[in-house]
């Protein structure tokens, strides 16, 4: 993404970063690290905080609305990612000190998004503002503890596997939505509720909409545990203890 290139350059050259997002499909415009892909593996490098972050609603509304709605993918993922962190902690596998207050903060963000779901689907100023404010709230939770465990988990790992398998990019929030749909079911984590919320928001997460063939998705799911085990930097999730068949 352009914002990741900008963050990387700002970090390397020690320059001020001015961020003016044109779509809200991912939270990268609010986070300090640059997401760099190396052989389809994602690495987060450096630190460049937007100074200032400029939100122009006219610019955002000029984009296809589905690209802004996609922004809720990295917020709805709190539902599955927080479950994964709680699960990992219960198994003594959490990579970080467990923070109940971080989990509770994530739940408040989800409630805020649920309360603004109609505006988000309408792509109006209140809906756009809700996504931006939720991203900022997420940062206030995650940056002090130096990780995004409440927002990234098994739902993101399916995306990583599919991206490596198919060797093509996706609209981030949409593919994360697919991960939420499937992994919330593996978790037995209120899947009908989170699916209803995604549907009400207008998030486009269906495989056919991303040209993901059934066989590719099935093979990705069957390979998911092996894929996760092969990546040293991926956190412990429900995938590690599940047999998908």
Predicted regions mapped to residue ranges:
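N-terminal small/polar loop signature for handling phosphorylated ligands or for N-terminal nucleophile
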Residues: 1-18, 119-127
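Generic enzyme active-site microenvironment
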Residues: 2, 54, 154
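Generic hydrophobic alpha-helical membrane-span motif
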Residues: 5-6, 27, 62, 161-162
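A glycine/threonine-rich phosphate-anchoring loop and its flanking beta-alpha core
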Residues: 11-109
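Generic alpha-helical structural context detector
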Residues: 74-77, 133, 160, 222
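C-terminal charged capping/lid subdomain of soluble metabolic enzymes
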Residues: 84, 188-245
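C-terminal intrinsically disordered extensions
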Residues: 89-118, 221-245
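Active-site segments that bind and position negatively charged phosphate/pyrophosphate groups
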Residues: 99-200, 205
